[in-house]
């Protein structure tokens, strides 16, 4: 296990370096700069600002300085938020995105597994058809449309919940449901498919022959093996939800990482775009490694060491 972890960490460092390099190159390949949109900025003032942030240095030197900062944990200053570093902004915005993401993750997991299990326990029934149709709609319909529908019907027409900002539990309902809808539908499909396969296994037939009830078979024998594909899916899903959905945070005016990222693109805030990209990539890599380490604990047939399964 230790050798596997170190091997994965070594690969993760290479992946992050490639991501930093490619993103840095793309940012500097785009015409213009972070201060090009300033109206009638005097050349002397513009030159002074660029010198302050070392934007007048050769690109290779900027890359070396930035890479050195990343190694020490410094993601640099924000070009558009005067006096604030990228680390500070991430530190302020990430807890909000994390709260939104964690709540959405819990709703998606609980709702998806429950719906998939009920559907698999009653195949070809009305409940099964309803879950299948709803999960198909949930996967197919874009998140921004789901959000817009919830805002209009639940927020404006029914007036049950606020439709903007992030100030308390009632403000969380619509954003969480919007963000959880697609992964919940996908988890329901994965759970249903996995359970239908498991229910065909010999040990399930033996359990039924012994007179065990449906819920006992589900919870003690079937569900653990059926949700293995769900666990694999949770790594990238958790990273995506924890860093916040750009669309959801924009629709509901939530001051999380997603909204800051969208603003930074319009403002060409290079360091912030790079910082968010690095942060998001590191989180994805870390969570994928974590899921790979947890996977063998759930299914002993899976091993992380080469050659041990031969």
Predicted feature descriptions by range:
Residues 16-64, 80, 155-174:
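Hydrophobic alpha-helical transmembrane segments of membrane transport/permease proteins
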Residues 26, 30, 38-42, 71, ...:
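Hydrophobic aliphatic residues
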Residues 51-60, 75-83, 187, 263-271:
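Membrane-interfacial helix-loop-helix junctions in multi-pass membrane proteins
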């Amino acid at each position: 296990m230790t050798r596997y972890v170190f091997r994965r960490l070594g690969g993760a460092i290479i992946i992050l370096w490639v991501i930093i390099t490619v993103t840095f190159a793309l940012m500097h390949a785009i015409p213009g700069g972070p201060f090009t949109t300033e109206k009638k900025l005097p050349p002397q003032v513009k030159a002074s600002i660029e010198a302050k942030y070392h934007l007048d240095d050769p690109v290779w030197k900027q890359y070396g300085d930035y890479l050195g900062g990343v190694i020490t944990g410094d993601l640099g200053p924000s070009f558009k938020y005067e006096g604030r570093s990228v680390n500070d902004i991430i530190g302020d915005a990430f807890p909000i995105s994390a709260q939104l993401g964690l709540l959405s993750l819990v709703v998606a997991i609980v709702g998806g597994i429950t719906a998939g299990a009920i559907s698999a326990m009653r195949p070809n029934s009305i409940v099964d058809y309803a879950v299948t149709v709803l999960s198909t709609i949930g996967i197919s319909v874009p998140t921004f449309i789901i959000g817009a529908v919830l805002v209009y019907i639940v927020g404006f027409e029914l007036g049950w919940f606020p439709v903007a900002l992030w100030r308390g539990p009632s403000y969380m309902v619509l954003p969480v449901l919007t963000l959880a809808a697609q992964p919940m539908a996908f988890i329901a499909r994965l759970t249903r498919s996995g359970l239908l396969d498991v229910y065909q296994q010999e040990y399930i037939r033996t359990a039924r022959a012994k007179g065990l009830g449906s819920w006992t078979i589900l919870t003690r024998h079937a569900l653990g093996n059926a949700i293995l594909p769900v666990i694999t899916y949770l790594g990238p899903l958790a990273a995506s939800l924890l860093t916040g959905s750009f669309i959801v945070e924009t629709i509901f005016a939530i001051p999380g990482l997603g909204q800051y990222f969208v603003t930074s693109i319009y403002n060409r805030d290079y360091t912030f775009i790079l910082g968010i990209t690095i942060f998001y990539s590191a989180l994805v890599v870390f969570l994928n490694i974590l899921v790979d380490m947890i996977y063998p604990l759930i299914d002993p047939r899976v091993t992380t060491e080469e050659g041990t399964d031969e």
